[in-house]
Amino acid sequence: MNYPIVIYPCAEGGFVAEIPALCGCLAQGETLEETLEELMIVKDLWLETAQTHNQKLPSLEAEIAKIKMLSAA
């Protein structure tokens, strides 16, 4: 699944990126490309761990609906 990603620039340089739907799924890097590469690794590990523990994955449709509600507010 392709969950929405939020990217923040860091004041000291570099970036932090997160997937809000996947609690704790975030990464940082010096460049945008490095940050996104790291985030994809973390996402894969997050999903693998969730499957190992038989956790239900967040619905992509629900996450998109949340974003639409937030942007309309």
UniProtKB/Swiss-Prot annotation:
It holds the Pfam family UPF0150. Gene3D superfamilies: 3.30.160.250. One of its GO terms (biological process) is regulation of DNA-templated transcription. It comes from the Bacteria. Belongs to the UPF0150 family. PANTHER family: ANTITOXIN HICB, UPF0150 PROTEIN SSL0259. This is UPF0150 protein ssl0259. It comes from Synechocystis sp. (strain ATCC 27184 / PCC 6803 / Kazusa).
